Amino acid sequence: MSNKRPNTTDGRTDLANGSLSSSPEEMSGAEEGRETSSGIEVEASDLSLSLTGDDGGPNRTSTESRGTDTESSGEEKDSDSMEDTGHYSINDESRGHGHSDEEDEEQPRHRGQRKRASRDQDSSDDERALEDWVSSETTALPRPRWQALPALRERELGSSARFVYEACGARVFVQRFRLQHGLEGHTGCVNTLHFNQRGTWLASGSDDLKVVVWDWVRRQPVLDFESGHKSNVFQAKFLPNSGDSTLAMCARDGQVRVAELSATQCCKNTKRVAQHKGASHKLALEPDSPCTFLSAGEDAVVFTIDLRQDRPASKLVVTKEKEKKVGLYTIYVNPANTHQFAVGGRDQYVRIYDQRKIDENENNGVLKKFCPHHLVNSESKANITCLVYSHDGTELLASYNDEDIYLFNSSHSDGAQYIKRYKGHRNNATVKGVNFYGPKSEFVVSGSDCGHIFLWEKSSCQIIQFMEGDKGGVVNCLEPHPHLPVLATSGLDHDVKIWAPTAEASTELTGLKEVIKKNKRERDEDSLHHTDLFDSHMLWFLMHHLRQRRHHRRWREPGVGATDADSDESPSSSDTSDEEEGPDRVQCMPS
């Protein structure tokens, strides 16, 4: 952690330096330059837990006074202890030259004691600032606007035709989420979940190379089959308007495959339709198309795939920053304008492309880019592990590793600042997912390395729900039901968990303060010991990979698995470079 002085101007403080900040628009250029990804910047609007978003009130005054105290302690730390040394020298000279040798020996000891006292005071101030922030984030929430009983009466009287739609977006239901049941059928980490359009089936993919289609209400698998992949299945999605008969899949082996399902509840075959030279983490579906979708890979390539063609895949773009390729972890199609799609990966930029206007000779084909301004020139290399569009395409949500979650207005111009920031979770160990929840994208939901699920109210950035989602320690995948107030989650555990608003009372967020503080401390410590972090990541990655190889060895024998339609016609990305094999591959490890 840097020893930069906190600034209390206008009541702003960077929490990593012991202070709070108001909004991105109010930050000066100098302050933005000082902000680092290792710290949690807290806007005053985030600290206010009222839905009005009022910056005023008594909390403001106390925050400013705390910021002043922190600044004074920060000045002591900055001196550490040049000013102290000068002070001691002046005192020594005033004593004259007649002091004893014993006094000379005691002076360094006194200096050390002063330094330790200064460091202890600074640590105490940081802890107090952290405690103040956590307390403000977890105070009582105001009364929700949507009330169940009045809404039920209106429905009975025929004046509320959209009861279910409104109920799914009501905070009171989200605060009553409780684990309903688990779906057990995998023998490895579950990396992907996807509901079909009707919401009756749920597809899951795993490190065990299997895909299972669940009747999640009856808690029974409808069918399960070998994916045909040779390594961890990262995504499996029903193609829309296909009668639930086609599943698209991608995996660590770089393959993009399609499974054809029959009405007799079996998988007829799987075939490879594209090949990345690097892991492929995500697919992007067009909302109404049963034949076309996009894939993105760590080789920086985006393929467009049309199942009606003899050669389904064609290269759409190679993502670059200047001349350097940027490996991709995530891709999403704008639901309101399917010509546009957004990608994120091994750097800090959200890139938006328009398929009709891609010219790699002009701005590398990019329509526009977004990035939190404090991360543009940050020394710590931030990666985007997941991004999603809102239901109407007006907003874009991006989750950064070892950082926070940011909301952008997708209609803003190139280089625009984020509009909201969501804090408290930890995104470090795996490629963490993020999603909107609610029919109008009213909430933001994310997993965390601490094994918990966090739900924020989108408008106020307040944590409104906090659930233990994974005993294995990491929650990666979160899939809202398309029509009901139901959430499916998965992670390092080998099961799928189904959540519904069946609790008798709203959550009390028990243990949230301790978890948030622990997450922030760990993030700060990792930022100070980046080399040790990389070593631990590499060890974790190698151990996990060796376990998976032993487990899957039997599936690698000839003749085992789905039919292999891997003809040479399936295109592969020839665009690869040594740049892609750096430590960033481990910074955003897949599960």
Curated annotation (Swiss-Prot):
Biased composition (Polar residues): 1-25
Region ranges (Disordered): 1-140, 552-591
Motif (Nuclear export signal) on chain: 40-51
Annotated positions of the Omega-N-methylarginine modification: 198
UniProt note on tissues of expression: Expressed in the brain.
Subcellular location: Nucleus; Cytoplasm
Keyword RNA-binding: no
Any one of the GO CC terms: mitochondrion
UniProt keyword annotations, A-Z: Cytoplasm, Methylation, Nucleus, Phosphoprotein, Repeat, Ubl conjugation pathway, WD repeat
InterPro entries in the record: DCAF8 (IPR045151), WD40/YVTN_repeat-like_dom_sf (IPR015943), WD40_repeat_dom_sf (IPR036322), WD40_rpt (IPR001680)
Pfam entry (one): WD40
Composition bias type Basic and acidic residues, residue spans: 66-100, 118-131
WD repeats: 185-224, 228-269, 275-315, 323-363, 379-418, 426-466, 470-509
Purpose: May function as a substrate receptor for CUL4-DDB1 E3 ubiquitin-protein ligase complex.
Further details from the record: The homozygous loop-tail (Lp) mouse has a severe neural tube closure defect, analogous to the craniorachischisis phenotype seen in humans. This gene has been mapped to The Lp critical region.
Family note: Belongs to the WD repeat DCAF8 family.
Subunit relationships: Interacts with DDB1, CUL4A and CUL4B. Interacts with KPNA1, KPNB1 and XPO1.
Record-given protein name: DDB1- and CUL4-associated factor 8
Organism of this sequence: Mus musculus (Mouse)
